A protein has these predicted regions:
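Cytoplasmic helix-loop-helix junction between adjacent transmembrane helices
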Residues: 131-172
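C-terminal transmembrane helical hairpin of 12-TM major facilitator-type secondary transporters
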Residues: 305-348
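Helix-loop-helix hairpin linking two adjacent transmembrane segments in secondary transporters
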Residues: 127, 156, 165-210
Length: 417
């Protein structure tokens, strides 16, 4: 996946939280030079973040061969990053509340870029995993804070537009990271591929630092563990939020598992695809640029529950197509699966804001935590099924998760309609 969650923003609540002054509140409006600087900075940050996070996914077979590890062990290079990102989300959001948005994001992106460059020098598998863990932990500082910065600084009338550009950067970054690493690995080596992506991300971090305006509406708050715990308990006692968290876990777990191991399958007989062609399969992600807004329009007409269930079913249909031996059917299945995932995920994530009674930012962080935890756990477990049962085993594992997502989504719709 490489896409960031689309979270509902309540502009009114942001405005009310601003300090009272005798001067009118100045937000950044569309069409101004500052708006262009903000959108360019956040777009490039989102692109770099998800390129760094997912660049290893298409080269998992290469890492398996070079370091002599199993597919399940190779997938840990991605799972450990998403797992540490999930854990970091619980801390970097509150940290940015205390010390500032821009400082956290700039530091996070620079650290992740440097760790990616260092990973190209590692000669042991454990060294690779340490670097990948640090990359995931660092990137949580961008994932947790980017949307908060936009909701604080952009005029409420243009928040949705700027958020859309930011999310586009995330999705394009996830695709380009996979695409570049696959192609460069095929023509050069995986070390050169990661070095190129690391240098690009470092340049993005420097540009981000230079052009992103300082926060005007940020007010530092002290870290209060007691308040965080009270809100945490409130969210888990809600009749809908825990089901949404579980839905995010299952959807992302299914998505990452399919793309982790489809490359292994297609590099075998009878297809024998090259590493570059496996990387090119990430263009399937582009279906999300159509399906996500389509899901939003359908939600306004039919409601969140039915639309989420429909697109989860689309994922299941796409998965079934990948079980055939025709390459065209497999790719069609990947297109359907990706379209269904991005649409279902956007509906689930947009449900968080309206459901949370307070501390909506923390509720969104808990959703993202569950989302990336699903990527980490399911992405690794899929390797066990691949090793023991081949693609049919992986497909069965994903099908179980999607059926569970349908059951959870059905109960969610029944409870909240």
């Amino acid at each position: 996946m490489s896409r960031t969650t689309a979270i509902d923003i309540d502009p009114a609540s942001d405005i009310d939280d601003l300090p009272a002054t005798s001067q009118p509140v100045q937000f950044i409006k569309r069409g101004t030079p500052q708006f262009m600087r903000v959108t360019l900075a956040l777009f490039s940050a989102g692109l770099a973040t998800f390129a760094l996070l997912y660049c290893v996914q298409p080269i998992l077979p290469v890492l398996s061969h070079e370091f002599g590890v199993s597919p399940a062990s190779s997938s840990v290079s991605l799972s450990i990053s998403t797992g540490m990102l999930a854990i970091g989300l619980l801390f970097t959001g509150p940290l940015s509340d205390a010390i500032g948005r821009k400082q956290v994001m700039v530091t996070a992106l620079m650290l992740a870029s440097v760790c990616t460059l260092l990973s190209t020098m590692m000669t042991s598998w454990h060294g690779i995993l340490v670097m990948r863990a640090l990359i995931g932990l660092s990137l949580s500082g961008v994932a947790a804070v980017g949307m908060t910065y936009l909701s604080e600084e952009i005029h409420p009338s243009f928040v949705a537009f700027s958020m859309g550009l930011y999310i586009s950067g995330n999705s394009i970054g996830g695709m380009s990271g996979r695409l570049l690493s696959g192609v460069f690995t095929d023509f050069f080596s995986w070390r050169i591929a990661l070095a190129v992506i690391g240098c690009f991300a470092l340049a993005s971090a420097l540009m981000f630092w230079k052009i992103l305006p300082e926060s005007r509406h940020f007010r530092p708050t002290s870290l209060r563990p007691k308040t965080l715990f009270i809100n945490f308990r409130l969210h888990w006692r809600d009749k809908g939020l825990p089901r949404l968290f579980l839905t995010g876990f299952l959807l992302m777990g299914s998505f990452v598992t399919l793309f982790n191991y489809i490359g292994y399958r297609l590099m075998l007989s009878p297809w024998h695809l090259s590493q570059a062609l496996v990387g090119l399969l990430s263009v399937a992600y582009l279906t999300g640029t159509w399906s996500s807004p389509k899901a939003g329009a359908m939600t306004a007409r039919y409601g969140r529950g039915p639309v989420m269930l429909f697109f989860t079913s689309v994922m299941l249909i796409g998965l079934l197509l990948t079980l055939f031996s025709s390459l065209w059917l497999i790719f069609a299945g990947m297109l359907l699966f990706s379209a269904g995932f991005f649409a279902a995920h956007s509906v689930a994530s947009s449900w968080i804001g309206p459901r949370a009674r307070r501390a909506k930012g923390q509720a969104s962080s808990l959703y993202l935590f569950s989302y990336y935890l699903g990527s980490s756990i399911a992405g690794t477990l899929g390797g066990v099924f691949w090793h023991s049962y081949g693609w049919n085993g992986v497909g069965g594992f994903i099908a179980l998760m999607l059926c569970a997502a349908l059951l959870v989504g059905g109960s969610l719709h029944k409870r909240l309609r």
